[in-house]
Amino acid sequence: MGVNEYLLVGLGNPGREYQDTRHNAGSLLLDDLSSRWSGSNSIEKYNSTFRKARVAGNSLALMQPLTYMNRSGLAVAEYVRFFKIVAENIIVIHDDIDMAPGRVKLVRGGGAGGHNGIKSINSSLGFVDYYRLKIGVGRPGKHGIHPEIPVDKYVLAPFSAEQLDIIVGRYDAIAAGLETFFRDSPAAAATVLNSLR
Protein backbone atom coordinates (compact mmCIF):
# COMPACT_ATOMS: atom_id res chain seq x y z
CA MET A 1 0.00 0.00 0.00
CA GLY A 2 1.17 3.50 -0.73
CA VAL A 3 1.53 6.63 1.32
CA ASN A 4 -2.17 7.50 0.94
CA GLU A 5 -3.38 4.39 2.78
CA TYR A 6 -4.59 5.20 6.30
CA LEU A 7 -5.76 3.15 9.27
CA LEU A 8 -8.15 4.67 11.81
CA VAL A 9 -8.64 2.49 14.91
CA GLY A 10 -11.40 2.98 17.51
CA LEU A 11 -10.49 1.24 20.76
CA GLY A 12 -13.01 -0.48 23.01
CA ASN A 13 -14.05 -3.81 24.45
CA PRO A 14 -16.25 -6.10 22.34
CA GLY A 15 -19.72 -7.12 23.50
CA ARG A 16 -23.00 -5.38 24.18
CA GLU A 17 -22.27 -5.01 27.91
CA TYR A 18 -19.36 -2.66 27.13
CA GLN A 19 -20.93 -0.81 24.22
CA ASP A 20 -21.69 2.55 25.91
CA THR A 21 -18.91 2.54 28.51
CA ARG A 22 -16.33 5.29 28.85
CA HIS A 23 -13.54 2.88 27.86
CA ASN A 24 -15.33 2.45 24.51
CA ALA A 25 -15.17 6.16 23.62
CA GLY A 26 -12.91 5.36 20.65
CA SER A 27 -15.17 2.63 19.33
CA LEU A 28 -18.28 4.83 19.70
CA LEU A 29 -16.68 7.62 17.69
CA LEU A 30 -15.54 5.15 15.03
CA ASP A 31 -19.15 3.97 14.62
CA ASP A 32 -20.16 7.56 13.88
CA LEU A 33 -17.28 8.13 11.44
CA SER A 34 -18.05 4.85 9.64
CA SER A 35 -21.66 5.94 9.13
CA ARG A 36 -20.45 9.28 7.71
CA TRP A 37 -17.70 8.07 5.41
CA SER A 38 -18.07 4.40 4.53
CA GLY A 39 -20.38 2.92 1.96
CA SER A 40 -18.82 -0.52 2.29
CA ASN A 41 -20.00 -3.48 4.32
CA SER A 42 -18.16 -4.42 7.48
CA ILE A 43 -15.41 -7.03 6.99
CA GLU A 44 -14.35 -9.37 9.81
CA LYS A 45 -10.67 -10.25 9.50
CA TYR A 46 -7.33 -9.63 11.27
CA ASN A 47 -8.97 -10.00 14.73
CA SER A 48 -11.12 -6.98 13.92
CA THR A 49 -14.06 -5.61 12.01
CA PHE A 50 -13.30 -2.87 9.54
CA ARG A 51 -14.81 -0.87 6.72
CA LYS A 52 -13.14 0.83 3.78
CA ALA A 53 -13.75 4.45 2.88
CA ARG A 54 -12.31 7.28 0.80
CA VAL A 55 -11.80 10.60 2.56
CA ALA A 56 -10.26 13.63 0.84
CA GLY A 57 -8.96 11.37 -1.94
CA ASN A 58 -7.25 8.95 0.46
CA SER A 59 -8.04 5.30 1.10
CA LEU A 60 -8.97 4.62 4.71
CA ALA A 61 -9.75 1.56 6.82
CA LEU A 62 -11.91 2.16 9.90
CA MET A 63 -11.10 -0.63 12.36
CA GLN A 64 -12.51 -1.91 15.64
CA PRO A 65 -10.46 -4.70 17.25
CA LEU A 66 -12.47 -7.77 18.28
CA THR A 67 -9.99 -8.45 21.08
CA TYR A 68 -10.42 -7.08 24.58
CA MET A 69 -8.77 -3.72 25.22
CA ASN A 70 -5.56 -5.09 26.73
CA ARG A 71 -4.96 -7.19 23.59
CA SER A 72 -5.80 -4.50 21.00
CA GLY A 73 -2.25 -4.59 19.68
CA LEU A 74 -2.76 -8.08 18.22
CA ALA A 75 -5.42 -6.81 15.81
CA VAL A 76 -3.69 -3.54 14.96
CA ALA A 77 -0.29 -5.14 14.36
CA GLU A 78 -1.76 -7.91 12.18
CA TYR A 79 -3.46 -5.35 9.91
CA VAL A 80 -0.49 -2.95 9.85
CA ARG A 81 1.99 -5.68 8.92
CA PHE A 82 -0.20 -7.25 6.26
CA PHE A 83 -0.96 -3.95 4.51
CA LYS A 84 2.40 -2.29 5.34
CA ILE A 85 0.81 0.82 6.85
CA VAL A 86 3.43 3.37 7.92
CA ALA A 87 3.32 4.93 11.41
CA GLU A 88 2.35 8.42 10.24
CA ASN A 89 -0.74 6.97 8.53
CA ILE A 90 -2.14 5.35 11.70
CA ILE A 91 -4.56 7.13 14.05
CA VAL A 92 -5.76 5.35 17.20
CA ILE A 93 -8.81 6.85 18.94
CA HIS A 94 -9.09 6.15 22.67
CA ASP A 95 -10.49 7.40 25.97
CA ASP A 96 -8.36 9.58 28.25
CA ILE A 97 -9.24 9.94 31.94
CA ASP A 98 -6.90 12.89 32.46
CA MET A 99 -8.96 15.16 30.21
CA ALA A 100 -12.41 16.56 30.94
CA PRO A 101 -15.34 14.90 29.16
CA GLY A 102 -15.50 16.17 25.58
CA ARG A 103 -11.96 17.53 25.47
CA VAL A 104 -10.09 16.24 22.39
CA LYS A 105 -6.38 16.08 21.66
CA LEU A 106 -4.40 14.84 18.64
CA VAL A 107 -0.86 13.77 19.55
CA ARG A 108 1.90 11.74 17.95
CA GLY A 109 3.83 9.16 19.91
CA GLY A 110 4.39 9.24 23.64
CA GLY A 111 3.83 6.80 26.47
CA ALA A 112 0.67 4.85 27.19
CA GLY A 113 -0.22 6.90 30.27
CA GLY A 114 -1.65 3.81 31.95
CA HIS A 115 -3.96 2.97 29.03
CA ASN A 116 -3.81 -0.80 28.51
CA GLY A 117 -4.99 -0.64 24.89
CA ILE A 118 -2.18 1.76 23.98
CA LYS A 119 0.33 -0.34 25.95
CA SER A 120 -0.69 -3.38 23.92
CA ILE A 121 -0.45 -1.52 20.61
CA ASN A 122 2.96 -0.03 21.45
CA SER A 123 4.26 -3.47 22.42
CA SER A 124 2.79 -5.30 19.41
CA LEU A 125 3.84 -2.73 16.81
CA GLY A 126 7.30 -2.17 18.25
CA PHE A 127 7.01 1.59 17.65
CA VAL A 128 5.07 4.45 19.23
CA ASP A 129 5.22 7.24 16.63
CA TYR A 130 1.69 6.78 15.30
CA TYR A 131 -1.04 9.36 15.92
CA ARG A 132 -3.51 9.15 18.79
CA LEU A 133 -6.79 10.99 19.10
CA LYS A 134 -7.60 11.21 22.80
CA ILE A 135 -11.21 11.66 23.88
CA GLY A 136 -11.59 13.03 27.40
CA VAL A 137 -13.89 11.04 29.69
CA GLY A 138 -12.92 12.63 33.03
CA ARG A 139 -11.34 11.19 36.17
CA PRO A 140 -12.91 10.44 39.56
CA GLY A 141 -12.05 13.28 41.93
CA LYS A 142 -11.77 15.77 39.06
CA HIS A 143 -14.11 17.28 36.49
CA GLY A 144 -17.06 17.19 38.92
CA ILE A 145 -16.88 13.39 39.23
CA HIS A 146 -17.30 11.68 42.63
CA PRO A 147 -13.80 10.98 44.03
CA GLU A 148 -14.53 7.58 45.58
CA ILE A 149 -15.28 5.70 42.35
CA PRO A 150 -12.31 3.40 41.52
CA VAL A 151 -10.84 4.28 38.12
CA ASP A 152 -11.22 0.74 36.76
CA LYS A 153 -14.92 0.70 37.63
CA TYR A 154 -15.38 4.24 36.30
CA VAL A 155 -14.02 3.53 32.81
CA LEU A 156 -16.04 0.31 32.52
CA ALA A 157 -19.29 2.05 33.52
CA PRO A 158 -21.64 3.71 31.02
CA PHE A 159 -21.33 7.41 30.31
CA SER A 160 -23.72 9.64 32.21
CA ALA A 161 -26.33 11.21 29.92
CA GLU A 162 -24.66 14.60 30.37
CA GLN A 163 -21.19 13.28 29.48
CA LEU A 164 -22.49 11.44 26.43
CA ASP A 165 -24.29 14.58 25.21
CA ILE A 166 -21.06 16.58 25.50
CA ILE A 167 -18.97 13.99 23.67
CA VAL A 168 -21.47 13.23 20.90
CA GLY A 169 -21.89 16.98 20.50
CA ARG A 170 -18.22 17.12 19.43
CA TYR A 171 -18.56 14.51 16.68
CA ASP A 172 -19.19 16.94 13.80
CA ALA A 173 -16.14 19.01 14.75
CA ILE A 174 -14.00 15.88 15.22
CA ALA A 175 -15.01 14.56 11.79
CA ALA A 176 -14.11 17.94 10.26
CA GLY A 177 -10.75 17.89 12.07
CA LEU A 178 -9.95 14.40 10.80
CA GLU A 179 -10.92 15.39 7.27
CA THR A 180 -8.40 18.23 7.66
CA PHE A 181 -5.79 15.61 8.66
CA PHE A 182 -6.40 13.62 5.48
CA ARG A 183 -6.80 16.63 3.18
CA ASP A 184 -4.20 19.07 4.52
CA SER A 185 -1.83 17.98 7.30
CA PRO A 186 -1.66 16.61 10.83
CA ALA A 187 -0.56 20.04 12.09
CA ALA A 188 -3.62 21.70 10.56
CA ALA A 189 -5.83 18.97 12.05
CA ALA A 190 -4.30 19.46 15.50
CA THR A 191 -5.16 23.16 15.34
CA VAL A 192 -8.82 22.22 14.81
CA LEU A 193 -9.03 19.23 17.14
CA ASN A 194 -6.97 20.49 20.07
CA SER A 195 -9.17 23.58 20.36
CA LEU A 196 -12.17 21.39 21.31
CA ARG A 197 -12.44 21.80 25.08
UniProtKB/Swiss-Prot annotation:
This is Peptidyl-tRNA hydrolase. The gene is pth. It catalyses: an N-acyl-L-alpha-aminoacyl-tRNA + H2O = an N-acyl-L-amino acid + a tRNA + H(+). It holds the Pfam family Pept_tRNA_hydro. Monomer. The record marks D95 as: Stabilizes the basic form of H active site to accept a proton. Keywords: Cytoplasm, Hydrolase, RNA-binding, tRNA-binding. The keyword Hydrolase applies. CDD domains: PTH (cd00462). Hydrolyzes ribosome-free peptidyl-tRNAs (with 1 or more amino acids incorporated), which drop off the ribosome during protein synthesis, or as a result of ribosome stalling. It is an enzyme of class 3 (hydrolase). One of its GO terms (biological process) is rescue of stalled ribosome. Its EC number is 3.1.1.29. TRNA binds at Y18, Y68, N70, N116. The record marks N13 as: Discriminates between blocked and unblocked aminoacyl-tRNA. The active site is at H23 (proton acceptor). GO terms for cellular component: cytoplasm. The lineage of its organism: Bacteria, Pseudomonadati, Thermodesulfobacteriota, Desulfobulbia, Desulfobulbales. InterPro entries: Pept_tRNA_hydro, Pept_tRNA_hydro_CS, Pept_tRNA_hydro_sf. Belongs to the PTH family. GO terms for molecular function: peptidyl-tRNA hydrolase activity; tRNA binding. It is found in: Cytoplasm.
